[in-house]
């Protein structure tokens, strides 16, 4: 709690790229865009099907060439202004000027404000994925004049190289978040190998001035379970069975049991998700690994230990 405000602070390992309409390269930036901006539709968390967002519902003509999106009447921008259909229309036209979005909505012939509370899409050809496309983060709508002002559950109040702060939007049109503020503390030095940052003690957050650091007392601390995915980039240099051999080496060779880290700090998982178990393949002996592989990873120091042991194990298989 900060000033009677429930606040979540997230130490983050890299500076965040500026938010802008359309496609964003980083997953963190994509997630932030989804919290700051809203689209005409959104994906239901349970079914992953598009449902109403800025539009409470929509209708499609029998030939599939006309889509009418009916807007909610209580929409407000983060600056308090009421949302008008003309605002959304302007921003949609701006998005269609972006090459990637122009391809995403290549079926759209034109967009019109056919009623003060209705936006209508006229299509060149039927596109029954239109509601899905509009639910994507890259199709979310910012104010046409202020690209960092949206209608999402959080509004952006600070964006610097060291701190990104979001505060809840009091006039949000859907269910309000429990948190009033979220802060990304950009602290890349804490995640460098030379700092010795461990997953047991990733970061300490202290509220106050630097000269008060010696007098502060701990309020709370804890360790929560985490996970780490190993993804294998599809390439002509790495066959399916070669990829399976790498996975099998990690899970079945006893490599994890030989790591010089705390007991049970790194263990093999048996499923990616509940009910989605990792298969155990019997890799044929004739399967040989490529001569070289590149492993990319970040934080914490336990993963450096893991990477070094994996490197030595793969080297014994003829892979550097």
Task: Write out the residue ranges for each language-model feature.
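Short, well-ordered beta-strand elements
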Residues: 6-17, 56, 66-69, 119-120, ...
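N-terminal lobe/hinge region of extracytoplasmic solute-binding protein
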Residues: 12-60, 93
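Aromatic- and charge-enriched surface segment that lines or borders ligand/interaction sites
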Residues: 25, 57-100
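Short helices/loops that flank or line small-molecule/ion binding pockets
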Residues: 80, 190-203, 308-317
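Surface-exposed binding/hinge segments that line
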Residues: 101-145, 153-158
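Ligand-site clamp/hinge motif
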Residues: 171-213
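Periplasmic-binding protein-like
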Residues: 223, 235-277
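Ligand/substrate-recognition segments at binding pockets and active sites
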Residues: 282-320
């Amino acid at each position: 709690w900060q000033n009677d405000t429930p606040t979540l602070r997230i130490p983050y390992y890299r500076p965040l790229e500026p938010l802008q309409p359309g496609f964003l390269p980083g997953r963190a930036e994509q997630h932030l865009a989804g919290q700051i901006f809203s689209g005409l539709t959104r994906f239901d968390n349970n079914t992953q099907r598009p449902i109403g967002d800025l539009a409470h519902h929509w209708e499609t003509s029998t030939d599939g060439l006309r889509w009418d999106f009916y807007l909610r009447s209580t929409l407000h921008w983060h600056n308090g202004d009421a949302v008008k259909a003309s605002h959304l229309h302007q921003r949609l036209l701006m998005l269609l000027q972006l090459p990637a979005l122009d391809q995403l909505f290549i079926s759209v012939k034109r967009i019109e404000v056919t009623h003060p509370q209705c936006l209508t899409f006229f299509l060149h050809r039927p596109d029954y994925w239109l509601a899905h496309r509009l639910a994507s983060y890259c199709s979310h709508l910012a104010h046409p004049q202020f690209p960092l002002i949206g209608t999402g559950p959080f509004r952006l109040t600070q964006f610097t190289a060291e701190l990104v702060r979001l505060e809840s939007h009091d006039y949000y049109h859907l269910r309000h978040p429990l948190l009033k503020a979220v802060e990304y503390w950009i602290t890349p030095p804490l995640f460098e190998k030379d700092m010795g940052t461990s997953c047991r003690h990733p970061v300490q957050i202290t509220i106050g001035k630097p000269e008060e650091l010696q007098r502060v007392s701990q309020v709370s601390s804890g360790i929560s379970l985490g996970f780490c995915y190993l993804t294998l980039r599809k390439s002509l240099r790495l066959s399916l069975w070669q990829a399976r051999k790498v996975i099998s080496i990690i899970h079945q060779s006893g490599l994890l049991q030989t790591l010089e880290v705390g007991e049970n700090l790194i263990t093999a998982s048996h499923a990616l998700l509940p009910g989605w178990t990792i298969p155990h393949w019997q890799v044929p002996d004739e399967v040989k690994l490529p001569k070289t592989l590149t492993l990319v990873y970040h934080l914490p120091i336990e993963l450096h230990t893991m990477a070094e042991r994996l490197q030595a194990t793969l080297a014994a298989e003829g892979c550097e």
